[in-house]
Amino acid sequence: MADVFQSERFFREAWPQFSRAFESPSDAASEVEWITGLAALAAGARVLDAPCGFGRHSIELARRGFEVTGVDFSETELERARAAAREAGVTLTLACQDIRDMEFAGEFDLAVNLFSSIGYFSDDEDRLVLDRFWRALKAGGLFVLDTRNRDQIVRSLPPEERKRVNGWTLRIENAFDPATSRWRARWSRIAGPGAARPGPPRGGPDEKRAAGEQLIGESEIRLYSAHELSAMLRPERWSRVELYGGLDGTPFSLDAPRIVLVARK
């Protein structure tokens, strides 16, 4: 079973240090355009974004005239979302809460769980999260879940990735365990010349960090195949369930980088 505390600590303490390195306002705008086109929402419709992080999708939804509630357990990320919303001139309702504890009931026309936000808990708790979203929707409401495609990532996950973040380099060391379907990553900060160039593979997990390299945190996520996620969703209680390979309507395939489940209550 995943070390749930480790994942919670990672997203509270480590993730806010570099989450903006994964920000793409243009992607968020196009993704929201596709989602809202599917949902066919009326002006003023209520939308749940959970977890919302620093609000890139929440803000795009609010720009389109929807009433947006964002839920996240990181107060740091919520503060960023508040600041970004003020700068964008939109209003968000933000709540600091674990998505496992959401108690909404029949309140939303659209609910979204985006950017690989499922899989950090036990399998039973992931099912609970999906139940929370079903309960939060009004009859006829739409749920959109977006995460990594296990069947693609097992064949393409690089042992190491690097990203530039505000003048320093983020190093990500990846490992996938096929026996448990878990993707573990070590996230490190590297300073100094040449930091952006990938180096040779590292040894064991307890090896000494290179000079100028600081371990920021470790994460672990359970990756699901499309049929596993579909079954966890309990499709019999939804009026329609569709599967895509991206938040642009790409058809799903083994080679699609994403699994996007779209379910109508």
Which residues does each predicted region cover?
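A short glycine-rich, Lys/Arg-flanked "PGG" loop and its adjoining helix->strand segment in the class I
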Residues: 127-139
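C-terminal lobe and adjacent flexible extensions of AdoMet/dcAdoMet transferase-like proteins
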Residues: 224-265
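Class I SAM-dependent methyltransferase SAM/SAH-binding core
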Residues: 56-101
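SAM-dependent methyltransferase
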Residues: 124, 144-232
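Conserved class I S-adenosyl-L-methionine
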Residues: 1-42, 44-53
